[in-house]
Amino acid sequence: MNQSLFHHSKQQEYCPQCGAPLQIKQGKKGLFLGCSAYPECDYLRPLQRSEHKVLKTLDEICPKCGNLLQLKQGSFGMFIGCSHYPECDFVVREESESEEKITCPECKTGHLISRRGRQGKIFYGCDNFPKCKFSLPAKPYSVPCPTCHFPLSLLKSEDGEKQIFQCANKTCRHIFEQ
């Protein structure tokens, strides 16, 4: 059997820190290039994946680095980001002015904002992350719990004028009507 079938034809890359060959490795966040001399050399670089398809280059300037912004199609839908990604990771965030800003009950200085997790699921977390790790699985409401007086609740169901809430305090989880 022809041995060339078992070798890739792409040119070998070498570690910029120690000169050893780079290897494709699997991590919890996907594939990356890592130094074959690990653990003596800890160089690694994420593999460039074409997961963001550029739909249009815009006339807007990136406020972080000064390059042009682009409309891109990602795995969670369309978004506007910097044309110099991954060097610049600026992404335009949608901010709805109509929503009230809810203060984080844990750190008292941050506000809870909508975020998207690794699997694309939306959750609400403190904008002081990573200093404050408070998060909720659904949209919080400023409805205090009648049992423990925690300031936030999650809307469980809505039926006409009747609303069922659940306390957002992980140690309480009391369900009540409003």
From Swiss-Prot:
Gene3D superfamilies: Bacterial Topoisomerase I, domain 1. GO terms for molecular function: DNA binding; DNA topoisomerase type I (single strand cut, ATP-independent) activity. One of its GO terms (biological process) is DNA topological change. InterPro entries: Topo_IA (IPR000380), Topo_IA_Znf (IPR013498). It comes from Haemophilus influenzae (strain ATCC 51907 / DSM 11121 / KW20 / Rd). The lineage of its organism: Bacteria, Pseudomonadati, Pseudomonadota, Gammaproteobacteria, Pasteurellales. One of its GO terms (cellular component) is chromosome. This is Uncharacterized protein HI_0656.1. To E.coli YrdD. PANTHER family: DNA TOPOISOMERASE, DNA TOPOISOMERASE, TYPE IA, CORE.
